[in-house]
């Protein structure tokens, strides 16, 4: 899996592929939003945002099992225990298949109350129903496609992973355009097109693992439920980042509808799309380095995984500078991609909201990296604390406090407060681990 190339070369190879994969992966939802906004209307786009927590749940399940499985498999391979790696890989895919099919059934049974729970009402109600109806049949594909994308990188094929994700994204763009602008299928068509593109990526990944060039492959196995006591905590830290993103979108949607109305929801929808892209970029640096960190951790090579941590901070620092400057300078242009110039007041509000929200990007990447590193070296309690703190506890508390005390545009500062509090906690956990390993 991991050859003896220089550590920096391996880091750049894995991280570049993962960042590109996750950035492209983000385009699935962004393309939906953009084409729905242009082809149906901005309130239809806002309705799609109401359904985003559902896709966040699907991705979070995929991330939890992908990162946990990938981490343990990498450790097994570092210890030359290939049969255990094969068994865990096979068990993981079978279990997730059952989970995905169950979710599809539950969504269709409880479709209308689920849409109301997400915040659908008035002009957004039917749009949300239609979007969920088009997406739900492909719940399994959303979970499995991301899961296999991570595992293929652990198998030593990061280039195949990014090529497959790009293929799926291009298919999504084409199918979205056909569904919305040619067939006039509206938001249902956008959702169904996205699902079909996920199905395509699943098929490509399965061909790899059913072929003869992979390091680990499908085997007969006996279900080992005990492994999940180790696996889920390892993946939970990264998965909860995605899950908390969905929960916070849900909470923001509710608070914004109360404080700022439908136009505020449109502004936040744009922020949510930008935020997803930025979070996934930072997750790409974290997750791309995790198999390498776990491999060197499994070998007992402390110098190796500490050097990888330094590389990670350098990469995060560069990306943070580029992203922060881009958001601050080009906020009106970013908002204009979704809204156009025909509504200048709404465009100005969206740009101002994006700049206020974007202050959190100064610390976001470092917090995600520290949580991911602690996952890779089997420190799940610390990693989970960081992820839950930055993604939910601190941010939800700040949001509700600012909504009550300030209201209006003050709520956009909740994320930067959350990231600052999380940074203090993350640095403490990381320094404690490094001191312990140095002793």
Residue ranges and their predicted role:
Residues 1-18, 73-140, 182-236, 293-360, ...:
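Short alpha-helical transmembrane segments in multi-pass integral membrane proteins
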Residues 27-46, 115-122, 178-185, 246-277, ...:
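Helix-terminus/linker motif at the lipid-water interface of multi-pass membrane proteins
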Residues 2-40, 53-68, 72, 97-104, ...:
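N-terminal transmembrane alpha-helices
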Residues 66, 135-153, 164-169, 190-205, ...:
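Short runs within selected transmembrane alpha-helices of multi-pass transporters and secretion channels
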Residues 45-105, 142-161, 267-331, 364-386:
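Small-residue-rich hydrophobic transmembrane alpha-helices
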Residues 12, 16, 28, 65, ...:
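Residue-level signal for transmembrane alpha-helical positions in Major Facilitator Superfamily
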Residues 33, 42-45, 82, 111, ...:
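Membrane-helix interface/capping residues of multi-pass secondary transporters
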Residues 13-32, 134, 145, 168, ...:
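Transmembrane helical elements of multi-pass membrane transporters/channels
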């Amino acid at each position: 899996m991991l050859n003896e190339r220089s550590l920096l070369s391996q880091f750049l190879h894995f991280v570049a592929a993962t960042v590109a994969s996750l950035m492209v992966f983000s385009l699935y939802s962004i393309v939906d939003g953009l084409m729905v906004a242009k082809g149906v209307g901005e309130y239809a786009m806002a309705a799609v945002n109401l359904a985003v927590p559902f896709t966040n749940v699907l991705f979070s399940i995929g991330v939890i099992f992908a990162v946990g499985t990938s981490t343990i498999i990498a450790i097994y391979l570092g210890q030359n225990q290939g049969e255990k790696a094969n068994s865990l890989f096979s068990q993981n895919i079978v279990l997730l298949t059952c989970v995905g099919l169950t979710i599809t059934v539950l969504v269709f049974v409880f479709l209308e109350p689920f849409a109301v729970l997400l915040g659908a009402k008035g002009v957004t109600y039917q749009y949300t129903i239609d979007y969920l109806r088009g997406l739900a049949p492909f719940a399994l594909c959303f979970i499995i496609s991301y899961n296999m994308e991570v595992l293929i990188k652990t198998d030593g094929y990061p280039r195949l992973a990014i090529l497959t994700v790009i293929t799926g994204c291009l298919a999504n763009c084409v199918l979205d355009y056909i569904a919305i602008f040619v067939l006039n299928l509206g938001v249902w068509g956008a959702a169904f097109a996205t699902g079909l593109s996920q199905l395509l990526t699943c098929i490509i990944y399965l061909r790899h693992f059913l072929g003869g060039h992979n390091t680990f492959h499908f085997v007969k196995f006996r279900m080992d439920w005990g492994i999940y006591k180790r696996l889920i905590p390892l993946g939970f830290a990264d998965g909860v980042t995605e899950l908390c993103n969905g929960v916070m979108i849900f909470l923001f949607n509710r608070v914004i509808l109360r404080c700022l109305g439908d136009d505020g929801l449109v502004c936040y929808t744009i922020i949510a799309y930008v935020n997803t892209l930025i979070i996934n970029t930072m997750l790409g640096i974290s997750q791309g380095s995790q198999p390498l960190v776990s491999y060197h951790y499994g070998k007992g090579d402390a110098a190796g995984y500490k050097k990888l941590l330094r590389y990670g901070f350098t990469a995060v620092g560069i990306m943070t500078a580029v992203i922060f400057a881009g958001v601050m300078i080009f906020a009106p242009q970013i908002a204009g991609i979704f809204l156009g110039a025909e509504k200048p007041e709404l465009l100005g509000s969206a740009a101002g909201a994006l700049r206020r929200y974007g202050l959190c990007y100064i610390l976001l990447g470092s917090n995600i990296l520290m949580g991911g590193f602690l996952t890779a070296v089997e420190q799940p309690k610390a990693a989970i604390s960081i992820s839950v703190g930055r993604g939910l506890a601190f941010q939800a508390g700040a949001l509700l406090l600012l909504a009550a005390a300030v209201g209006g545009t003050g709520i956009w500062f909740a994320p930067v407060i959350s990231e600052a509090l999380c940074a203090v906690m993350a640095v403490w956990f990381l320094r404690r681990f490094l001191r312990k390993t140095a002793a």
